[in-house]
Amino acid sequence: MCCISKQIAETGSTSKVLIMTDVSRAQRAAFARGSFLLLLAVSCHAFAFNPAAPHAIFQGRHPVLRARSSRPAASLKLRMVSQEMVQGVVDASQAGLHLAFADQGSNLAGKFFQASLLPYLAFLYFLNNNGAKTPKLSGFGFGFLLLFVIATIPTGIISKTVYGVSLADVDWLHGSAEALLTVTNILIAVGFRDAMSSGTAEGERGTLKIVAIAIAALVAGAAAIGSPVLGFEAHTPFLAGLGDLPSNFFASMGAASEPANALSIPTWAIHFSSVFEWIFAMRLVWDYADASKDQTWKGLTWGMLPLHASGVAACTYHFFYNNPDLSFLVALQAGLTCLGNFTVAIAAARIALANGWKVPFFSSTEAASQQGDEKKQFLESKPPQESDTMLIAKLAGLTVTSAYLVKYGELFLSLPFQANAVAAIAMVATPPALLASFYLQKAAAAQEAA
């Protein structure tokens, strides 16, 4: 849901795609293979096994920056990417990347996208400082989001250059990229939940990390071979449309026919799971403030609210079948993402300051390290109210039910087939407003109890 770069794929003019007549299908296929596998290799090395990588950048210790002098093995791994893949990136990137970023630079969504990245890196930097007591798995999850950001750029380019449409209209690519966001939210939520149940923020869950990387590899592989090898079309459903009902299933009951770009059940399920997991993560962050005896963590819950609204904006756009007359929703989504990245960065900075963070180069490294070690104390253990199995069952049931209700329920309404801007804005504003009201009441109750 916190779609930092989803807008790069959901906006843009189809006419600009048609200008790219000099880019052959073979070049596009090579670009699809090369860009994804190269980006995946870099991303996994830089972030996947080191959630504090953005923090290391600010300290001049980033593993990629020092690979040539101190990590020759890491450099060798990157060189293992085949020459064909690299050449594919070189051949097609000038046309493809120019299209994506030139097109985005000319609209509001693109400007928001560009402005979103730096504050998110700042957020990761503050969140991963030694004294913040951020659960390690959650820190890994927030860093894993960058893999989703990277993935949406090539998938968006593939959507435009191969199919001539936006990523939102290419269901199999759309669902694949969105799956990385779902994985991100699961990592974040599980990290906070484990920390509170075990009483320590040091839990790693190495197996879960490996599964996350494996899913990222599957997404990369699918994007690389989906069109040139498997022959996937623009509207090929994600996961073969698992769970989709026949197109005329409700025709006798007066239901309208779905447009060709309607989301499949798996893609809708991925969207709803991301929304619900993010809401759950916000609640866990709020509770973590009490467990860690650090009330500044509650500010992060508030900082996450615009990112929740961004996810709702994306779902609203899909509810209206990505109607181009409602393209302002894409800009709104991008703006909310940009705002949310600033608010979580500010919240993380408050957490860091409350736990002894000092401006780099103006404080003793030894003192900062000693202070960080002192902060690695046990949290107040808080056993979960329900088992993992029950929680997963509830989330799965809510996700699948929501996917079916929206996908097939909207066929009985006229609203999704109209460009009703007022209704769209109301749909975007209502869930975040209700969530804000909920936390205002919790804050008021806590003040009264104190």
Regions found by a protein language model. Give the residues of each.
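N-terminal chloroplast transit peptides
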Residues: 1-80, 367-371, 377
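N-terminal plastid-targeting presequences
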Residues: 66-450
